[in-house]
Amino acid sequence: MSTDMKTSNKYMSLAAITLAFSFTFLSRYIWSPLMADVSGEFGINATQAGLYMSAFFAGYLVTQIPGGIMADRYQPKYILIACTILGGAMTALMSRITSYEMGLVIRVITGISSGCVMAQCSKVVALTFAPQERASAMGVVLASPPFGITLAQSLGAPLNQAFGWRTTFVIVGAVAVGV
């Protein structure tokens, strides 16, 4: 493989993992601009609405260490793809909730899928970039949180206003498939 092809591939990998990590933040923070409408439809109080974020982070927390172990043992690219697709599917599935409890379960599963992502991204950087390039590559990856949060906060309300909260969840979930 030519040097140009290797360079192109590593930057394509960097773009892919950055988008995947960004999606985890988009999917977790899209709840904020949709919260009022969902809460109104289901009679969810502020404490219950806050628990939707906590449910996500509970799932996220329990997969941090297993995600790192999987990154060391298996192909991180495939784990990253599976986690991103599962996260997208769960985000889209939020559009179909019929009860508060169903939403909690979906948010936990979304957190579980997202919790493995950072370890996979780190492993891809370690495998793809030379030691002297890794900090720069990780700098790009670590721009994902504010990027994903900015997308959620800036697009969530207009999408909700234009299409409703259910369709907004579907749109955000579909983004994962595109990643």
Where are these regions (language model features)?
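Extracytoplasmic
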Residues: 13-46, 67
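Small-residue-rich transmembrane alpha-helices and their cytosolic helix-loop interfaces
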Residues: 21, 53, 57, 84, ...
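Small-residue-rich segments within alpha-helical transmembrane domains of MFS-like 12-TM solute carriers
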Residues: 25, 29, 111-119, 150
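Residue-level signature of mid-helix packing/kink "hotspots" within the transmembrane helices
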Residues: 29, 57-65, 149-150
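MFS 12-TM fold signature
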Residues: 60, 84-91, 110, 175-179
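Conserved MFS/SLC helix-loop-helix module at the cytosolic interface between two early adjacent transmembrane helices
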Residues: 62-101
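Cytoplasmic helix-loop-helix junction between adjacent transmembrane helices
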Residues: 106-145
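Helix-loop-helix hairpin linking two adjacent transmembrane segments in secondary transporters
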Residues: 141-179
